[in-house]
A protein has these predicted regions:
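Catalytic active-site module of serine/aspartate enzymes centered on a nucleophile-bearing elbow/loop
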Residues: 231-269
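Short beta-strand/loop motif that positions the catalytic acidic residue
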Residues: 201, 207-209, 213
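Conserved alpha/beta-hydrolase
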Residues: 34-58
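Catalytic nucleophile-loop/oxyanion-hole region of alpha/beta-hydrolase
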Residues: 24-27, 53-82, 86, 258
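Short alpha-helix in the alpha/beta-hydrolase fold that links the catalytic acid
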Residues: 203, 217-227
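Acidic catalytic loop of the alpha/beta-hydrolase fold
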Residues: 212-216, 248
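Active-site glycine-rich loops that stabilize anionic/oxyanionic intermediates
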Residues: 22-25, 211
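Alpha/beta-hydrolase-fold enzymes
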Residues: 94-179
Length: 269
């Protein structure tokens, strides 16, 4: 795991943010966010998940449980090198699931967490009970395609802006094939586990989710927030539904405003 960083050009940063990218992509797709964070006075750390981007491993084929453990370890490394004790987490899609799971495993040393389109319930929605029966096969044949279609098939699924999908398709570091069985199965099971443990959430949390997301189910975010607030009615936990937005809310027309909202939320915490 190769963790990279960008430091704000001030002696004392306002905070430190660890950014976690989604399935099939890489950390370089979050330049707009990291640029804005650095400009606002935040130090930013990021890395490519195993099997993604420039990281080692078979392409997009990984047990998501490993990625969660990697994230917990990355947080320890970030704390050791951070110029401030104010640590924030950001995660998108699968990275949102990983970030939430990491937060639940170790809620210490965190000022707050922001997620966009977290993969608590990846689409199409397959019951966890069914997936558990497939797990032995997934470990035996991890690269077996779980889906017959790629993210490129048909209309844009990432953003209402077709240029976002075109850029993804042209990017040599993104994965365009179907979801490998091991990745898909463990993502669903980890999402189910995170939703089951949502009532343990006490860390300040803000989730953005597009109402027209075709890759991760908005119901997953609603369930997480509902369960967390039911257990802790006074908790600082909120869901903002972005009307009409697809999966990558930061790459929608509302994206610049959402980035400003994220920075404002970090400042408040």
């Amino acid at each position: 795991m190769h963790i990279q960083s960008r430091f704000a050009h001030i002696t004392t940063p306002k905070g430190t943010v660890l950014v976690s990218h989604g399935y099939g992509e890489h950390s370089g797709r979050f330049t707009a966010l990291t640029d804005a964070l650095v400009e606002a006075g935040y130090d930013v750390f990021y890395y490519d998940h195993y099997g993604h981007g420039t990281a080692e491993g078979p392409r997009a084929t990984v047990d998501v449980g490993r990625l969660i453990r990697d994230h917990v370890n990355a947080r320890r490394i970030v704390r050791a090198h951070a110029r401030t004790t104010d640590i924030f987490l950001f995660g998108h899609s699968m990275g949102g699931l990983i970030t939430a799971a990491s937060m639940l495993l170790d809620p210490t040393h965190l000022r707050g967490t922001v997620l966009t389109g977290p993969a608590f319930r990846p689409l199409p929605d397959i019951p966890a009970s069914t997936v558990r029966k497939l797990l032995p096969l997934a470990r035996l044949m991890p690269s077996l395609p779980a889906t017959s279609t790629s993210i490129r098939d048909g209309e844009s699924v990432l953003s209402r802006d077709p240029e976002v999908q075109k850029a993804f398709d042209a990017d040599p570091l993104t994965w365009k094939g179907g979801t490998p069985l091991l990745t898909g199965a463990t993502m669903i099971l980890q999402g189910d586990e995170v939703l089951r443990r949502a009532d343990q959430t006490t860390t300040p949390l803000l989730i953005f989710h597009g109402s027209a997301d075709k890759l991760t189910d908005l119901k997953g975010s609603r369930t997480f927030v509902s369960n967390a607030i039911a257990a802790h009615p006074d908790a600082d936990i909120h869901l903002r539904v972005v009307d009409g937005a697809y999966h990558e809310v930061l790459n929608e027309p509302e994206g610049p405003g959402i980035i400003r909202d994220i920075i404002s939320w970090f400042k408040q915490h």
